[in-house]
């Protein structure tokens, strides 16, 4: 399983970088610029997952990888909403992004100071999971706020897609379906992971890449 996880992470990084090159070589539209940011922050997230996978001998080492992951997730959530708004012609007001930025600031301060307070993680310990070690955490109030934010973003996108679909052109409808399908897969992964279906394995890299 360790080598499968390694291969998935590396494949995801290479795929994202190749898509980034394709977009940058064009004259980017607003939707493409949003995708570039989405792509960059997804790569940052996957690098964090890889760091956690390779260096988790101590809580401090594993936490370094987690910090990189949350930097990626913070930018990913804002870029995802912007990309969905531009690509599927959803109308997302500007103040939503301001709220996102404020939440992400609190989250990043929380995770970068997680060793010194219980607000992001209540507890952290290293577990041996066969061929690799991993960190096991218990989420605190800021951690819960982050995932409420993530759920709110995914739900908002799905609702906006549903509202806009009937009044859209054929081309717009196709784009809306793409966004709704990709967003739905990501949401499903989070739900199944929360229910413990995947055990210690977290397929979030696959979901974000899709």
Range-by-range predicted roles:
Residues 2, 6, 16, 47-51, ...:
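Interfacial "cap-and-anchor" motif at the non-cytosolic start of specific transmembrane alpha-helices
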Residues 4, 29, 53, 57-59, ...:
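Intrinsic-disorder/low-complexity, polar/charged segments
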């Amino acid at each position: 399983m360790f080598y499968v996880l390694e291969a998935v992470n590396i494949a995801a990084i290479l795929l994202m970088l190749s898509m980034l090159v394709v977009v940058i070589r064009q004259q980017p539209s607003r939707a493409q610029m949003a995708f570039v940011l989405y792509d960059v922050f997804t790569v940052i997230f996957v690098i964090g997952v890889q760091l956690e996978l390779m260096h988790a001998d101590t809580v401090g080492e594993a936490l370094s990888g987690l910090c990189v992951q949350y930097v990626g997730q913070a930018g990913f959530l804002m870029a995802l909403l912007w990309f969905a708004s531009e690509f599927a012609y959803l109308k997302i007001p500007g103040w939503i992004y301001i709220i996102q930025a404020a939440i992400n600031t609190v989250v990043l301060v929380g995770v970068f100071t997680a060793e010194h307070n219980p607000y992001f993680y209540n507890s952290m310990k290293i577990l041996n999971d066969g061929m690799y070690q991993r960190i096991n955490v218990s989420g605190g109030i800021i951690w819960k706020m982050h995932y409420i934010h993530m759920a709110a973003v995914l739900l908002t996108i799905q609702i906006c897609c549903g509202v806009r679909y009937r009044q859209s052109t054929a081309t717009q409808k196709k784009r809306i379906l793409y966004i709704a399908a990709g967003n739905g897969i990501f949401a499903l992964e989070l739900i199944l992971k929360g229910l413990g279906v995947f055990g210690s394995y977290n397929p979030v890299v696959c979901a974000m890449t899709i």
